[in-house]
Amino acid sequence: MALLKPFPLQHSLRCMASRFLLHSHYHTHTLSFSSISLSRPSIVLNPRVINKLRRLSDAILIRNMVSLRAFMSSSTTTEAFQENTKSKGYGSEQIQVLEGLDPVRKRPGMYIGSTGPRGLHHLVYEILDNAVDEAQAGFATKIDVVLHADNSVSIADNGRGIPTELHPVTKKSSLETVLTVLHAGGKFGGSSSGYNVSGGLHGVGLSVVNALSQALEVTIWRDGKEYQQKYSRGKPITTLICHDLPVEMRDRQGTAIRFWPDKEVFTTEMQFDYNTIAGRIRELAFLNPELTIALKKEDIDPEKIQCNEYFYAGGLVEYVKWLNADKKPLHDVLGFRKEADGITIDMALQWCSDAYSDTMLGYANSIRTIDGGTHIDGVKAALTRILNNLGKKSKTIKEKDISLSGEHVREGLTCVISVKVPNPEFEGQTKTRLGNPEVRKVVDQSVQEYLTEYLELHPDVLDSILSKSLNALKAALAAKRARELVRQKSVLKSSSLPGKLADCSATNPEEAEIFIVEGDSAGGSAKQGRDRRFQAILPLRGKILNIERKDEAAMYKNEEIQNLILGLGLGVKGEDFKKEALRYHKIIILTDADVDGAHIRTLLLTFFFRYQRALFEEGCIYVGVPPLYKVERGKQVYYCYDDAELKKVQRSFPSNASYNIQRFKGLGEMMPAQLWETTMNPETRLLKQLVVEDAAEANVVFSSLMGSRVDIRKQLIQNSASMMNLEQLDI
């Protein structure tokens, strides 16, 4: 493992693979800029414009992996200056009426979440989900997705094809209606709906994509004819063209849409990530076992062309097997499918002996409900009740006053549940939580019936699950005692802080930030170079505990972990996270750009992810990017963040130029002023904000990389070794 220069984090998280996208963000007290993959020259110690620094260093940039997906994402935001002026008047002339698709272009974030990378990819998902709805309705079996070299995307299915007849209300073709009118679609339910079950509810998906595309082309195959029409920024620029298909093609049906995102809307990030889209496609293929989805990325360089086909006949059972590939299962994957009261339930689950947290994924009409909902609540309630009842019935749980909590029962559980609901109630356009109360009852009863019958017929499986749950209870009691001991030692609740923490004078956590640095040497430079008004420094003594392999009791006894919990104000694991309790809202990991530094970054990320995952969800975790090289030519000094920048600087010099190159092996080698100028100054530094995009895949990666299975870790490294630049080997 010591072969890779920035191995544990850079390559490990490269291995963690395309599951990781990192958000670059730097902040001043008046303006906030953020970027991803934007070009930036090396830092020169002269006055500079902040925008010149907007680029992501390859230090831990994760993208372009083949078989893995980004589980951390980046969003790009720029906060415009708001002039504080009083309105000159407020009358009827100030009341604006936005017509057609103007509301979408005026406030795109309301429809796609953001105008950064996440919103950009949301356009693809809107069209993709429409195609999947055709598959769920039983009319489509194949979807082709192509990421073209000109940064357009095309999605084609073999479903029924969007209707093209004249619509009785709009007096336009039905195709133009769904493309140009908000809340027009065939998925509103009822006898007149074109779909019994669908993920689209508001009739805005296709029209929103059209509104936010500088160009969109649609082709329909239906009733032996081919229809074509072109649009720009939500408006048709051609009429609907129709011609007959050749005799041999008259059975062809389906819809193909190709769109070019509007540069006026997506001004900061216009690059589609293959692996991010591949992850969503893989998910949809697991959820729809009769559907085949092909993904291709075109490129002018033949070696960079990527393509994969996703088909999983085993459905959710295969999904759980994939999620648990690096774990030690206690039993075979359990799975069932049932329909009750018009709701279809598809579920698979498995407990693993070497996992100490649960992974529960919920879907409603193939839409990932990242915030859970009534279907997840139903599963949790049923599991807790079933295992307590069967445990007491089998005398495995003997004490009358002991009951297993949901947390104990679910330790080591991987569960995926997908429900198909005719009239789902989602929270918001982004559909992050399912709200139908009737779903909880149906799911609860279905899980109760299936799991009770199965476990009574397989007492060995029941015994292994109960043994795991009872061990979780004992570990929780031991951890509770350890927490109390820690509290008594003034680690969690005392006002005293770790001795090595150099705190800042700011008392508002929103204004304060803390750098977690590697060792006293780097800590000394950082303490001298920082701005004491709002920057705190916490030096670590060597590598912290790998909590992936330890229980809570051992974690709380570790001094470095104690320092992190107290210094950052993380509270107690398992308790509700309160951002206002944090001492700093910006937690910056700042380590050396070598093997040890990358390993420490990975250990810290593992700790934060397992101990308080909400830190990622709240956008509190950052990685600082120090320069690798210092180039001096005369009075000019250049700082380069990777080998590519170094070569670029060298090429800019005359062939006979004389200059000196210094490679920084550690932060301790940098003078405090250098560290401030290049790495800590909010006006010139480069930070990467880490946000969990897919908790399930993040869980898989952390388990693979930091768990006890050497064979799985070795396989992960070998599978990704071919993607490593040989020049980055540290031999």
From Swiss-Prot:
<keyword id="KW-0479">Metal-binding</keyword>
<dbReference type="Pfam" id="PF02518">
    <property type="entry name" value="HATPase_c"/>
</dbReference>
<keyword id="KW-0934">Plastid</keyword>
<keyword id="KW-0413">Isomerase</keyword>
<dbReference type="InterPro" id="IPR018522">
    <property type="entry name" value="TopoIIA_CS"/>
</dbReference>
<feature type="site" description="Interaction with DNA">
    <location>
        <position position="543"/>
    </location>
</feature>
<keyword id="KW-0799">Topoisomerase</keyword>
<dbReference type="GO" id="GO:0009507">
    <property type="term" value="C:chloroplast"/>
</dbReference>
<dbReference type="GO" id="GO:0006265">
    <property type="term" value="P:DNA topological change"/>
</dbReference>
<dbReference type="InterPro" id="IPR011557">
    <property type="entry name" value="GyrB"/>
</dbReference>
<keyword id="KW-0067">ATP-binding</keyword>
<dbReference type="GO" id="GO:0003918">
    <property type="term" value="F:DNA topoisomerase type II (double strand cut, ATP-hydrolyzing) activity"/>
</dbReference>
<dbReference type="InterPro" id="IPR034160">
    <property type="entry name" value="TOPRIM_GyrB"/>
</dbReference>
<dbReference type="Pfam" id="PF01751">
    <property type="entry name" value="Toprim"/>
</dbReference>
<dbReference type="InterPro" id="IPR013760">
    <property type="entry name" value="Topo_IIA-like_dom_sf"/>
</dbReference>
<dbReference type="InterPro" id="IPR013506">
    <property type="entry name" value="Topo_IIA_bsu_dom2"/>
</dbReference>
<feature type="binding site">
    <location>
        <position position="594"/>
    </location>
    <ligand>
        <name>Mg(2+) 2</name>
    </ligand>
</feature>
<dbReference type="Pfam" id="PF00204">
    <property type="entry name" value="DNA_gyraseB"/>
</dbReference>
<dbReference type="GO" id="GO:0005524">
    <property type="term" value="F:ATP binding"/>
</dbReference>
<comment type="subunit">
    <text>Made up of two chains. The A chain is responsible for DNA breakage and rejoining; the B chain catalyzes ATP hydrolysis.</text>
</comment>
<dbReference type="GO" id="GO:0003677">
    <property type="term" value="F:DNA binding"/>
</dbReference>
<dbReference type="InterPro" id="IPR001241">
    <property type="entry name" value="Topo_IIA"/>
</dbReference>
<keyword id="KW-0496">Mitochondrion</keyword>
<keyword id="KW-0460">Magnesium</keyword>
<dbReference type="InterPro" id="IPR006171">
    <property type="entry name" value="TOPRIM_dom"/>
</dbReference>
<dbReference type="InterPro" id="IPR002288">
    <property type="entry name" value="DNA_gyrase_B_C"/>
</dbReference>
<dbReference type="GO" id="GO:0046872">
    <property type="term" value="F:metal ion binding"/>
</dbReference>
<dbReference type="InterPro" id="IPR020568">
    <property type="entry name" value="Ribosomal_Su5_D2-typ_SF"/>
</dbReference>
<dbReference type="InterPro" id="IPR013759">
    <property type="entry name" value="Topo_IIA_B_C"/>
</dbReference>
<protein>
    <recommendedName>
        <fullName>DNA gyrase subunit B, chloroplastic/mitochondrial</fullName>
        <ecNumber>5.6.2.2</ecNumber>
    </recommendedName>
</protein>
<dbReference type="InterPro" id="IPR000565">
    <property type="entry name" value="Topo_IIA_B"/>
</dbReference>
<keyword id="KW-0238">DNA-binding</keyword>
<dbReference type="Pfam" id="PF00986">
    <property type="entry name" value="DNA_gyraseB_C"/>
</dbReference>
<keyword id="KW-0150">Chloroplast</keyword>
<dbReference type="InterPro" id="IPR036890">
    <property type="entry name" value="HATPase_C_sf"/>
</dbReference>
<comment type="function">
    <text>Seems to play a critical role in chloroplast nucleoid partitioning by regulating DNA topology. A type II topoisomerase that negatively supercoils closed circular double-stranded DNA in an ATP-dependent manner.</text>
</comment>
<dbReference type="GO" id="GO:0005739">
    <property type="term" value="C:mitochondrion"/>
</dbReference>
<keyword id="KW-0809">Transit peptide</keyword>
<dbReference type="InterPro" id="IPR014721">
    <property type="entry name" value="Ribsml_uS5_D2-typ_fold_subgr"/>
</dbReference>
<feature type="binding site">
    <location>
        <position position="592"/>
    </location>
    <ligand>
        <name>Mg(2+) 1</name>
    </ligand>
</feature>
<feature type="binding site">
    <location>
        <position position="518"/>
    </location>
    <ligand>
        <name>Mg(2+) 1</name>
    </ligand>
</feature>
<feature type="domain" description="Toprim">
    <location>
        <begin position="512"/>
        <end position="619"/>
    </location>
</feature>
